[in-house]
C-alpha cells in the first residue's frame, strides 16, 4: 500500500518543493483548500480531502478534516489487530505524514485594526486536532509543522526510505510545543479582551531568539527568548549592526540602560554596569549628554553599556571610541559615526525604537517553585500630588536636579540613593541593606560635587541619619516618598540645615 501524506498549510514557504519531494518518493498527497490549489497550479497531482472523507468542505472551510476517515487514518495503531480490522471494515486508509501549520492567529491579532470577529475566525480547530492526533501516534506518523524541518524529512526518506524514530519523536514534541504556544496566544487574547488581570492559570509563550554562549557565569547554560508581542522598544527586538554576539549579561545590562533612557524626553545618555546606572547625563544635544554621563563616573563607565535616546553623531562617536565599551544602543547612528565605531570589531552596536513603556506591560520574575507577575513601574512624578513639608521650597535649579535624580533612582537596586547636579548624576548608592549605607556610598562617590546637589531616595527614611549625612555633605534638596512614622524627625533635621525636601507619596523599590 502506498504511503499517504495530508498537506494543509497556512504558511506556504517551501511547501511546493516539499510535496514534489514526497511525490518523488512515491507518497500520495491529500490536500485541502488553498494549499491544494497552489500545488495543482504548480503541476503537482494531489487528492482532494473530500475524496477521502466522502463529504464536502462546509461552513466556509470550518469543517473539512474533522472526519473519522482522517482521524482514524492518523490514530490507528498499525500493529494492533483490532485497529487494522476496524480500518478494513470501514474503508479507512492510514495516513503516514501530516504537514500542517495553523491559521495565522498571532499575525491577525497583531494588526492594529483587527476586530474581535476576525480574531475568532482565525482560531484554527481542524489543524490542531490533526497534528495532535498525528503527534500522539508518532510511532507510525511523521508530523511536520515547521518548514525548517522539510529538508530533514526528505533527506531521511531518500536515504532510508522512512523517517527515523528519533526524528519522529522530535517532530511530535515540536507539535505539542506549537499547539501549546498557539493556545496560549488565544487564551491570553481572550483574557485581555475580558479585562481579567489575574486569571486562575497563567500561560505564557516565548519564541527562541538565540542560544547564548553561557549564562551569568561560564558554568551556566542560557538561551534568549522573546515575547511574541514584546514592545519594539526592547532589546529583544533591537537590530544589531556590528560587533560580537550578545551575552546573557549584555542583554540584562542593555535592558536596564534602555529602561532608564526612556525616562527622558530631552537628549540623554545612560551608562550602566551590572544593571545599575553609573552615569546619567542630559543636555541640549547628545554629545553634551554623553559628556555629562561620562563625567558622572569616568571610572565605572569603562566596560559599560551606553544607551542614548538620540542618533549618535560623528562627534559623539569619536568620544565613545576613546574608551572600552561593551554595547552602544541608540535609535540610529549616522554613517560617519558607524565608520568610527565599527573600527572596534567587538563593540556591539544596536538600534532600537525609544518609547517609554506603559503600565500595560507585565514584569515576570521567577522564584523557586513559582512566578511573580506585576505591572512595570512606569509611574512618573506627578507634581500635582507632591507635598513640601519643609520650610524652604526647592529652587528652580534644585527642582531640575531633583527630577533627574528621581527618574534615575527608581532604576537603581534598593536601597537606592542618587545624587544629581547640573544635568547629571554625581553619585549612585545601590543595593545596600540599610539606606544610610547607600547614602554614604553616593556621597563618597560625589566628593566635593555633593555640595549644592540634590538627593533622591527610592523609599522613605526610617530614621533621620540619612538626612544628617546629606547635611554634612552640603546637599541642599531631597526628594523621597515620605510616609515614615519618623518623618517629623527628618523634617526637623532638614529645616535645621535649610534643606528643601519633597514628598512624592510614591515608593520605587527595585529588587
Curated annotation (Swiss-Prot):
Residues 1-145 form the MGS-like domain. It catalyses: (6R)-10-formyltetrahydrofolate + 5-amino-1-(5-phospho-beta-D-ribosyl)imidazole-4-carboxamide = 5-formamido-1-(5-phospho-D-ribosyl)imidazole-4-carboxamide + (6S)-5,6,7,8-tetrahydrofolate; IMP + H2O = 5-formamido-1-(5-phospho-D-ribosyl)imidazole-4-carboxamide. Keywords: Hydrolase, Multifunctional enzyme, Purine biosynthesis, Transferase. Pfam families: AICARFT_IMPCHas (PF01808), MGS (PF02142). Pathway: Purine metabolism; IMP biosynthesis via de novo pathway; 5-formamido-1-(5-phospho-D-ribosyl)imidazole-4-carboxamide from 5-amino-1-(5-phospho-D-ribosyl)imidazole-4-carboxamide (10-formyl THF route): step 1/1; Purine metabolism; IMP biosynthesis via de novo pathway; IMP from 5-formamido-1-(5-phospho-D-ribosyl)imidazole-4-carboxamide: step 1/1. The IMP cyclohydrolase activity resides in the N-terminal region. Transmembrane segments: none annotated. The keyword Transferase applies. One of its GO terms (molecular function) is phosphoribosylaminoimidazolecarboxamide formyltransferase activity. It comes from Bacillus cereus (strain G9842). InterPro entries: AICAR_Tfase_dup_dom_sf, Cytidine_deaminase-like, MGS-like_dom, MGS-like_dom_sf, PurH-like. GO terms for biological process: 'de novo' IMP biosynthetic process. CDD domains: IMPCH. Its EC number is 2.1.2.3, 3.5.4.10. GO terms for cellular component: cytosol. Belongs to the PurH family. This is Bifunctional purine biosynthesis protein PurH.
Amino acid at each position: 500500500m502506498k504511503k499517504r501524506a495530508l498537506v494543509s498549510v497556512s504558511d506556504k514557504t517551501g511547501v511546493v518543493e516539499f510535496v514534489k519531494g514526497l511525490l518523488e518518493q512515491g507518497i500520495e498527497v491529500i490536500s485541502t483548500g488553498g494549499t491544494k490549489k497552489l500545488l495543482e497550479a504548480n503541476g503537482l497531482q494531489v487528492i482532494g480531502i473530500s475524496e477521502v472523507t466522502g463529504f464536502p468542505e462546509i461552513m466556509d472551510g470550518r469543517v473539512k478534516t474533522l472526519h473519522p476517515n482522517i482521524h482514524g487514518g492518523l490514530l490507528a495503531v498499525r500493529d494492533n489487530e483490532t485497529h487494522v480490522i476496524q480500518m478494513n471494515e470501514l474503508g479507512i486508509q492510514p495516513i503516514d505524514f501530516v504537514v500542517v501549520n495553523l491559521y495565522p492567529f498571532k499575525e491577525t491579532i497583531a494588526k492594529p485594526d483587527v476586530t474581535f470577529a476576525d480574531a475568532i475566525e482565525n482560531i484554527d480547530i481542524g489543524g490542531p486536532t490533526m497534528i495532535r492526533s498525528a503527534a500522539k501516534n508518532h510511532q507510525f506518523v511523521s508530523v511536520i509543522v515547521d518548514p525548517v524541518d522539510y529538508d530533514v524529512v526528505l533527506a531521511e526518506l531518500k536515504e532510508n526510505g522512512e523517517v527515523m524514530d528519533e526524528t519522529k519523536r522530535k517532530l511530535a514534541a515540536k507539535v505539542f510545543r506549537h499547539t501549546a504556544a498557539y493556545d496560549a496566544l488565544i487564551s491570553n487574547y481572550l483574557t485581555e479582551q475580558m479585562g481579567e488581570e489575574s486569571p486562575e492559570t497563567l500561560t505564557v509563550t516565548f519564541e527562541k531568539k538565540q542560544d547564548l554562549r553561557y549564562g551569568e557565569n561560564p558554568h551556566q547554560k542560557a538561551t534568549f527568548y522573546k515575547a511574541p508581542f514584546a514592545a519594539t522598544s526592547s532589546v529583544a527586538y533591537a537590530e544589531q549592526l556590528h560587533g560580537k554576539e550578545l551575552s546573557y549579561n549584555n542583554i540584562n545590562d542593555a535592558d536596564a540602560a534602555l529602561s532608564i533612557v526612556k525616562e527622558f524626553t530631552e537628549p540623554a545618555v545612560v551608562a550602566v554596569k551590572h544593571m545599575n546606572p553609573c552615569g546619567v547625563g542630559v543636555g541640549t544635544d547628545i554629545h553634551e549628554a554623553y559628556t555629562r554621563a561620562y563625567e558622572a563616573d569616568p571610572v565605572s563607565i569603562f566596560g559599560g553599556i551606553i544607551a542614548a535616546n538620540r542618533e549618535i553623531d560623528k562627534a559623539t562617536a569619536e568620544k565613545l571610541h576613546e574608551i572600552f565599551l561593551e554595547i552602544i544602543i541608540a535609535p540610529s547612528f549616522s554613517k560617519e559615526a558607524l565608520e568610527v565605531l565599527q573600527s572596534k570589531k567587538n563593540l556591539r552596536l544596536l538600534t532600537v525604537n525609544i518609547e517609554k513603556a506603559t503600565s500595560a506591560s507585565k514584569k515576570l520574575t521567577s522564584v523557586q517553585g513559582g512566578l511573580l507577575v506585576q505591572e512595570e513601574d512606569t509611574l512618573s512624578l506627578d507634581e500635582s500630588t507632591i507635598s513640601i513639608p519643609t520650610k524652604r521650597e526647592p529652587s528652580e535649579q534644585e527642582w531640575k536636579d531633583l527630577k533627574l535624580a528621581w527618574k534615575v533612582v527608581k532604576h537603581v537596586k534598593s536601597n537606592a540613593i542618587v545624587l544629581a547636579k547640573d544635568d547629571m548624576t554625581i553619585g549612585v548608592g545601590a543595593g545596600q541593606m540599610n539606606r544610610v549605607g547607600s547614602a554614604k556610598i553616593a556621597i563618597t562617590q560625589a566628593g566635593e560635587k555633593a555640595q549644592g546637589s540634590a538627593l533622591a531616595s527610592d523609599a522613605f527614611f526610617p530614621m533621620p541619619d540619612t538626612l544628617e549625612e546629606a547635611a554634612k555633605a552640603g546637599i541642599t534638596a531631597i526628594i523621597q516618598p515620605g510616609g515614615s512614622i519618623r518623618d517629623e524627625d527628618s523634617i526637623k533635621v532638614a529645616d535645621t540645615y535649610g534643606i528643601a525636601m519633597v514628598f512624592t507619596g510614591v515608593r520605587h523599590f527595585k529588587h
